[in-house]
């Protein structure tokens, strides 16, 4: 919880760096990037607050003398694929709750804003999340299909979170289905 709260504070402190980097990469306005950082920092705070709400539960059993329990455990590695058009908000959203639930994450950065997405990873590392907990992958646009296939097919990856176009979302959904992996799509 404390590391996510620290990451939120660091993100706020680095607002100017996010604005400068984002404007250079996508040409958007300072106001838009400032809003992105503010909302993303608050998403980290919300995820931090959720860490105290994650618990198991007792489930009524119809078998006399038996007790059923629901236990929540981390899934493992979660892949987030975030777009360029609201890069700080959407990448942070893909990472925050999986981290709060004890998972590790891989963010496949958008080819249009790799430095902005890399900054998110740097903030989380600086906040104290250990090596390998948050991983940011950048690549050339022409390598995207192979990168996505490798990420989705990797046996350590347990869930995929994608925000982007319907065309690419369909490809990711088909690939995830081939490996029987749950995918969350915002198209």
Question: Language-model features: where?
Answer:
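N-terminal Rossmann-like NAD(P)+-binding subdomain of aldehyde/semialdehyde dehydrogenases
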Residues: 1-66, 126
């Amino acid at each position: 919880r404390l590391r996510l709260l620290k990451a939120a504070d660091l993100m706020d402190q680095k607002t100017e760096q996010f604005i400068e980097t984002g404007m250079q990469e996508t040409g958007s306005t300072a106001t838009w990037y400032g809003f992105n950082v503010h909302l993303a920092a608050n998403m980290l705070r919300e995820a931090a607050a959720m860490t105290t709400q994650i618990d198991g539960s007792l489930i009524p059993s119809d078998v006399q003398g038996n007790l059923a329990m629901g236990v929540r455990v981390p899934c493992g590695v979660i892949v987030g694929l975030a777009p360029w058009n609201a890069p700080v908000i959407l990448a942070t959203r893909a990472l925050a709750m999986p981290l709060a639930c004890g998972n590790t994450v891989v963010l496949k950065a958008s080819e249009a804003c790799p430095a902005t997405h890399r900054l998110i990873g740097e903030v989380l590392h600086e906040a104290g999340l250990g090596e390998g907990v948050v991983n940011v992958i950048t690549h050339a646009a022409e390598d995207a299909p192979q990168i996505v296939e490798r990420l989705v097919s990797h046996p350590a990856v347990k869930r995929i979170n994608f925000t982007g176009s319907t065309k690419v979302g369909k490809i990711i959904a088909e690939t995830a289905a081939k490996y029987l992996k749950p995918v969350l799509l915002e198209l």
